[in-house]
């Protein structure tokens, strides 16, 4: 699936938003990808997950389980696990820390792929990885529907940015790169005009 097609999917779902946004990473941006609007359509969710699964299979990665950080990554992760024919689990934030709950367990050495809907710096994905690794599993890679251009994905010429948090030694799969402006709160030009950011993401609402 080409970049143009994926971008069109987001536009048709009214999921490519322009404005002033506070991202879950704490940074500000003039664009936001609201994947929930895309994934509310089961057929679209299935097709995106199948395309992502094809890339992962072509790479030859062995996966036992897909794990996603709640809430934003759950739909994407579940559909990807279904496309790959593997188990799905999720972590959720408890008192500020990503935690595996609800009876989910991982085995020692279990090969886990961490999946988000969108990865910017990858902070939440890494927190989920740390939790399953603490319990004995082995994280073998990361995946997302789209990469906001800070982490280097398999098959992309974009270079890894200094604030990327995904470990560079593990493969990162995404269907496309969406490169939008990203600002620290202190340097945000939108804030300097008096605009206040809104927070449409998964931390806080």
Swiss-Prot record:
GO terms for MF: magnesium ion binding; orotate phosphoribosyltransferase activity
Pathway stated in the Swiss-Prot or TrEMBL entry: Pyrimidine metabolism; UMP biosynthesis via de novo pathway; UMP from orotate: step 1/2
Question: What's the family?
Answer: Belongs to the purine/pyrimidine phosphoribosyltransferase family. PyrE subfamily.
The keyword ATP-binding belongs to this UniProt entry's keyword annotation: no
Q: Which InterPro entries match?
A: OPRT, Orotate_PRibTrfase_bac, PRibTrfase_dom, PRTase-like
Cofactor(s) in the UniProt record: Mg(2+)
What UniProt keywords are attached to this protein's entry?
Answer: Glycosyltransferase, Magnesium, Pyrimidine biosynthesis, Transferase
Reactions this protein catalyses = orotidine 5'-phosphate + diphosphate = orotate + 5-phospho-alpha-D-ribose 1-diphosphate
Residues given in the record as 5-phospho-alpha-D-ribose 1-diphosphate binding sites:
116-124
Question: What residues does orotate bind to?
Answer: 120, 148
Kindly state a single biological-process term from the GO annotations of this entry: 'de novo' UMP biosynthetic process
Q: Which organism is it from?
A: Wolinella succinogenes (strain ATCC 29543 / DSM 1740 / CCUG 13145 / JCM 31913 / LMG 7466 / NCTC 11488 / FDC 602W) (Vibrio succinogenes)
E.C. code: 2.4.2.10
Under the heading SUPFAM superfamilies, the entry gives: PRTase-like
Q: List the disulfide bonds.
A: none
Under the subunit heading, UniProt states: Homodimer.
Could you tell me what this protein is called?
A: Orotate phosphoribosyltransferase
Instruction: Give the protein's biological function.
Output: Catalyzes the transfer of a ribosyl phosphate group from 5-phosphoribose 1-diphosphate to orotate, leading to the formation of orotidine monophosphate (OMP).
Residue spans crossing the bilayer: none
Kind of enzyme, top EC level? transferase
Glycosyltransferase: is it a keyword of this entry? yes
């Amino acid at each position: 699936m080409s970049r143009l097609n994926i971008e069109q999917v987001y536009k048709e779902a009214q999921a490519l938003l322009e404005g002033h946004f506070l991202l879950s990473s704490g940074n500000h941006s003039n664009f936001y990808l609201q994947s929930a609007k895309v994934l509310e359509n089961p057929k679209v969710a299935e097709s995106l997950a199948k395309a992502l699964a094809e890339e992962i299979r072509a790479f030859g990665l062995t996966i036992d389980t897909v794990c996603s950080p709640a809430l934003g990554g759950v739909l994407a992760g579940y559909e990807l696990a279904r496309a790959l024919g593997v188990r799905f689990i999720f972590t959720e934030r408890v008192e500020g820390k990503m935690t595996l709950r609800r009876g989910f367990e991982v085995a020692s050495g279990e090969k886990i792929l961490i999946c988000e809907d969108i990865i910017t710096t990858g902070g939440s994905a890494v927190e989920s990885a740390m939790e399953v690794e603490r319990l004995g599993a082995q994280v073998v890679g990361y995946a997302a529907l789209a990469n906001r251009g800070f982490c280097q994905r398999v098959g992309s010429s974009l270079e890894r940015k200094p604030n990327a948090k995904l470990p560079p030694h593990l493969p990162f799969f995404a269907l496309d790169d969406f490169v939008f402006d990203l600002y620290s709160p202190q340097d945000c030009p939108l804030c300097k005009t008096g605009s206040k950011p809104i927070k449409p993401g998964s931390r806080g609402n």
